[in-house]
Amino acid sequence: KTDTGFKIVTDFSQYEAKAVVATTRDEIIACAGSKYQPHPQLLGLREAAKAGLKRIAITCTPCNALSVRKMMLDPDFEDIVGNIVLVISNICGAHWSRHGTEDLITEWMGLKLEDVAGIKYRARPFPGQFSVTLKNGEVHEKGFVRGGGLGRLAKFTPEECRYCLEKVASVADIVLGDTWHHHVLSPDLLDKYTEEEIAKDERIPLAKEGMTAVVVRSEIGQKFVDAARADGAIKLYDEPEDTARQFLCAVHDLGKPICNGPVINTRVVRGQPVREYV
């Protein structure tokens, strides 16, 4: 018997990423935006299957896209993944632990976790503000990409991300991401153009507002993109094959191989497992 007691209750729900089954346009839009935090994305698949959904599109990281494809090849998972018709992934550098988000809120922003009502990692304007809405309605913001928030997350990189080279989701139907490393539209180039140069290329002012690179990797993905384009839901600027290849090579080669290469080599020397790519 004790006369006193205590318990610690931590509510992560206001800033923890989670899988969501969205069935309406508004629900999909509410889920939009980058989530720089790992979360069990595939848990939503079972929920979608239980709901009886017959045509399922899933958005996930490249590593989760690979898991989905493996499940789709295994008859034991037919009841869960049998109705997936589209796999959409993102260009991925890493997914930093929830502790990284907590560090941004408490140490970088100087706020209390228990006061948080919601967060956005990359609120407008582009390339993004780390935005924290408090329960009292106050909104606090700092530059996430250019203000140091993104770089601060590096020390919270999970081990599994340190030896991953899967950046542009080779097994997804469609891959979406920023235009970093594009020879014209990379965000670090956009403020360097003259008014004359901007007037000659209508993509540049649009890119300043935030432009998405779209990589189509399958016939199913192409049909989906073509339908969205025909309906006027999206506006696309087609790239010549050599330009697209140059962009994708830059995204891959200037990203994970440089950052993760030394880690992978060290693991090989130590006899530790690494991912094999063929």
Question: Which functions belong to the PLM regions below?
Answer:
Residues K1-V278:
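Iron-sulfur-associated redox domains of electron-transfer enzymes in respiratory
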